[in-house]
Each structure stands twice: as structure tokens, then as C-alpha cells.
Amino acid sequence: MATSPAEPSAGPAARGEAAAATEEQEEEARQLLQTLQAAEGEAAAAGAGDAAAAADSGSPSGPGSPRETVTEVPTGLRFSPEQVACVCEALLQAGHAGRLSRFLGALPPAERLRGSDPVLRARALVAFQRGEYAELYQLLESRPFPAAHHAFLQDLYLRARYHEAERARGRALGAVDKYRLRKKFPLPKTIWDGEETVYCFKERSRAALKACYRGNRYPTPDEKRRLATLTGLSLTQVSNWFKNRRQRDRTGTGGGAPCKSESDGNPTTEDESSRSPEDLERGVASMAAEAPAQSSIFLAGATSPATCPASSSILVNGSFLAASSPPAVLLNGSPVIINSLALGENSSLGPLLLTGGSAPQPQPSLQGVSEAKNSLVLDPQTGEVRLDEAQSEAPETKGVHGTTGEEIPGALPQVVPGPPPASTFPLTPGAVPAVAAPQVVPLSPSSGYPTGLSPTSPRLNLPQVVPTSQVVTLPQAVGPLQLLAAGPGSPVKVAAAAGPTNVHLINSSVGVTALQLPSSTAPGNFLLANPVSGSPIVTGVAVQQGKIILTATFPTSMLVSQVLPPAPSLALPLKQEPAITVPEGALPVGPSPTLPEGHTLGPISTQPLPPASVVTSGTSLPFSPDSSGLLSSFSAPLPEGLMLSPAAVPVWPAGLELSTGVEGLGTQATHTVLRLPDPDPQGLLLGATTGTEVDEGLEAEAKVLTQLQSVPVEEPLEL
């Protein structure tokens, strides 16, 4: 019986074992070999007996002929290839390199040479343990191995190269030395698929990830799992690759040269089954970046817009007035020069954005006083006054008359609705010629002020500027004047407040000096037109002790027009008069454009407002029937925080008489001076101190429109 030879050189694992463990392993190996030899001997003996019996029966011999001797049983180990492969695979998986070496040493040379894949891998491991690297390289290059064992054999090959170089150099290798060895001695094709590894992702894995990314940038968790199984990557690596690729595409680096790193290496538990917020904000940002429509006045809060809506706009308390930018303000082609702008130290002021453009499209109001919602429109281009109807497609009518008991809808944005009509007053018949556009000088460069007014407080305040303000009053008015609503492209945005908000407007064309806007924001339209090309508008803006001082000097031919479509639930009361005579050339207001020409304007159904909702003022600017005023007796004091100095406000004659002169509607014809003095608790003084002086001024002869140079002062002057 043959015994297994002693192990020439024990591996590191065998040297680390105790002597008792070594003896036990040798004893187990002897028992295994004895068992295999006994089984092989029995099989050989049975085969030899059968052969001898066949020889005896097949070749009878004579009596004197000698018998052939029986073939001896071979003394060497004879195992089947399957048995040898099974034992080698079991020892390889168990990691017993010493026992594997002893088993291979006990096999005949013929068995070792014709060994299968497990035998060759076992021989390669034994050669590595013994330090026989040449035999290891020969074994690995002898035949191709399955891809499942490439990682194990590649590790053996590289470790053998490293140990061989360390033995030759006499020192340990660094990372650079190992990298150079890998480049100098590439892996054999028998244990390598030939694909270059880019960090931890192979070419095939990257191709699969890119193909999936082109079809779906946000794969579901199930798709990620299937992709991880297909590429041999983990779910974390797949998720990181998709996240990094999307980030590179957003920053613009994904479409250029291919990036070597496909993952940042940071593990993540994020599932990423839904779209990221950055991608969802793309559509919203593109929509928000669109500039708002022109011909709008934005009365916003303290926050300024993110972008300038148009090149012809001005943002007070903002950065749109920079010297390096294009002209900040262009009113119909004429530049506006901003002088003494000192708003940098007060950053809490709300922005005032003024833009100019075309008129908006009217919308029908929700709460109308009458079915036909009409508006008086003064066309700044043609100089004609027309009556627009929200439901009609023909926006212009020139000869419009009313009948008895009908209501007159007009056009203003967000005006307090009046009560139902209760009384009437007649209008004398007369022709209605088209009148030219008036040429007036505005008192202030701004058309409105953002305000917040509670239902119980009589004060008008500017948000985030001053906490107190004064009263905006409406007279004992009759008959609601329904107004059209503006289109969505031309909004009048007012800062939200707890109660109704007030905006002070200067509207000389229709004789309105005060408006009340409810808290609900409704769109409107204001146009500031300058017919004189190349004529600049000089304005001065300054902030002193929480107050805004606005000074303006406009050319005498400056045209201030107002195109106001109707708004829902808005009405402007009219002063009740026993009879208003409309002289020839005056401006009548009709209820509908469908009435025939030549008829007279009948009485207008009106009803006084409740006394509780009217705050009387000590001084106002009434328009008598002789002056053909449509709207009268409005007092509009300025707020305390926004003050116009008496010396800084241009002085111009008051008493806007509606006559048939060549000057058009709103010709100014008295010596009475219209001033905006220092605010007082009694109200704003317009013109003279009493209504009698104003009436006397209206009867005086017409004078030429005058204009004074604006001189800003440090402190307001008392009258």
C-alpha cells in the first residue's frame, strides 16, 4: 500500500496550524487514500477475474500445456476523473490548501496531467503556495477558464507578479509599482474578458446604463433592480449613476466629452422613483421668467420683482435704474431723467413699477349694475372719446344718447360699488360731437400709491413706509357708475391688506380725483403718453425721514390719458343735482351704444350712498352744472408718509371745464390754482379755501396754461 509523500513546503495556513492538527489532517488523508485504494482494488480484482475466466473458456489448452499467470493488480492509485474533480472542488471551496497539496501529490502523474478544470485550478493554487510562479503562469495560459472563476484566477496571477517583483527588488511595492506591473503584464485572455475597467464600471455596464438613460431618465425601483442584475452592479451604484448623469446634463457637462467617472462613490438610500424638484421647477421657472404684459401699473409689496419686465420700465427702490443698463424709463419714446434718486438707505419701501403699452382687453364684471357694461375711453392717438361695451365687438361709438331711468356704466379699476338707483335727474338734449384729447399737466409722476385701509380706520397708509395716513373721502353721491374689468394681461396689482385699499389717482380727463380699491386685486390699465417726441420728462425722487418727496416738471404739451376697462363689482357715485345742462361740445355719457342719434340724455337713476360710508371733507373741488362736470365733489388728501411739497409741486390752473374749444376735453380756464399742500387732518385743499371761490374762478375768463419750475424743499410748508 502506497503512502502519500510528505509535503515539500507547507503553505502559510499549514505552517500556522498546530502539530496535532497537522497529524489529524495527515491521518484523514491516509484514511481517504486507503478507502479509495480499497475500492479501486476490488474493482481491479473483479475485472481480472472476469478476464481470466474468459481466457480459460475461449482458449482450451491441452493437458500438458501450462496455464497463464493472472495479471497483477496495479499498486498505484486509480480514480475516475469525476472523483478527482469532486475532491479538488471540495478542498478548494473549504480553503484547505495543505490538504489539497497532499491529495494532488498522492495522485499518479497521468491523473494530474489529464485533470479537468477543478484539478487545474487546484494545481494553480498549490503552485502559488509553493512559489512556483512559472508553473502558475503556464497553467493559467494553458486553457480558457469559465468566467465565474476569472476573479479568483486574476487575483492569483496579479499576486504572483507582485511577489515575484518584491522578491527581485527586495522591498515592498507601492501603488505606482503595482500599476506599472499591471500595465507591463496584462492579464491573460484565458482569465480575462478583454474589457477595460473604468474605475468600478465596465464598458458593457456603462453601455447598458446609457441605453436605459436615453429611454427613461427616471427608472422605477424595479427597473433599477433589473438593471443592476444585468450589469453586475449594486442598486446603490445604479441609483448614483442616474443621479450624477442627470446632474451633469442639467449643468451642461453631460453632452460634451465622455466623463470617466460614472459615480461619485457615495452610497445613497434614495430610491429616486420620482422626478427631482429641480426638473419640475424648469417649467415653472420658464413660465415665471416671462415678462408681465405692458401697459400695467404694479403696486406691489416690499419684495421687488426678480426680473425687469420690459426695457421701458422703472422700479422704485430697485436695481432697474442702474447707469449701465438701457434707459430705465421710456414713455412712448421719450426718455425720463431721474434726478436725486436716494432710495438706497430705505430698503423697506415697496416697489412701484410703471410700464406703458397698449390697452387691455375688457372682461365682463361679476357684479354689474346693468346688463350692458360700458366704458368711456379717451383714445390718445385719435383724440376721440368713445363708449366701449364689454359685450359688443364694435368698441367705438360717437353719438350716444340715453333715455329716462337708465343707468350709466363707466370705466375705472376697482371702485367701491354704489347702492341701487333711487332718484333721477334730467340731462338736456344736445348733439354729441367727438372731442379732442385734453392736454393737461399731471401733478405727480406716479399714477397711484399702494395703500391699505381697514374697514374702521379712516387713515390711508403706505405699507412698510409710514404707519399712519389721512382720509380719502367720497361725497354724498348718487347713481353707481359701473366699470369694466381689465384683461388678464394688464393687471393693477395692489398690496394685500386686511380691509379695502385706497389708491390716489390723478385723472383729469374724467374729473376723478380719488378712488377706493377693495382688497381683491383686479387688473386695470393706465397710459402716460407724451405726444411731443424727444421731449424729456424730468422727475425727482427723494426719501427723507421715512417720506417720499416726488417732484416733476412736465412739458406743457404732455398728454395724460387713462384707458380703464370695467372691473367687477365697482361703481363710482355721482353727485345728485336737480338738473345738469350739457352745453354744446360737452361730453355726455350714454348707457348703450345701440341708442339712435339725435335723442336726448334722459334722467339718470341714482340713489345716495349710506351716510355712514361717506366722510365729508371741509374742502373739495366741485364741478357745477355750468362746467359740465360729470363727476364732482371728491376730496383726496395725500397720505402723511408720501408728501408733495407745495414749492415742489408744479402749479397749474384748476377748474377743468368741458367745452367745445380747440383745446379738447378738460381745457383749463380759470385763475384758480390747484395745489397739493401739506396734509392736514381736515383733508386735502384743492384750489381755493372754499367752494365759493372755486365757483367764482370757474366763471372767469380762460387763461393760458402755466407751469412753474419745481423746487424741492427739505421740509413741507404750511399754508
UniProtKB/Swiss-Prot annotation:
GO CC list: cytosol; Golgi apparatus; nucleoplasm; nucleus
Record GO biological process: cell population proliferation; lens development in camera-type eye; Leydig cell proliferation; negative regulation of cell population proliferation; negative regulation of DNA-templated transcription; negative regulation of skeletal muscle satellite cell proliferation; positive regulation of transcription by RNA polymerase II; spermatid development
DNA-binding region listed in the record: 194-253
UniProt superkingdom: Eukaryota
Keyword Transferase recorded: no
Predominant place of localization: nucleus
One function term, GO molecular function aspect: DNA binding
Localization terms from the record: Nucleus
Alphabetized Pfam families for the sequence: Homeodomain, SIX1_SD
Swiss-Prot/TrEMBL keywords: Activator, Developmental protein, DNA-binding, Homeobox, Nucleus, Transcription, Transcription regulation
Keyword Transcription regulation attached: yes
SMART domains: HOX (SM00389)
Assembly behavior: Probably binds DNA dimer. Interacts with EYA3, and probably EYA1 and EYA2.
PANTHER family: HOMEOBOX PROTEIN SIX, HOMEOBOX PROTEIN SIX5
Family as reported in the entry's similarity comment: Belongs to the SIX/Sine oculis homeobox family.
Protein name, as recorded: Homeobox protein SIX5
Organism of derivation: Mus musculus (Mouse)
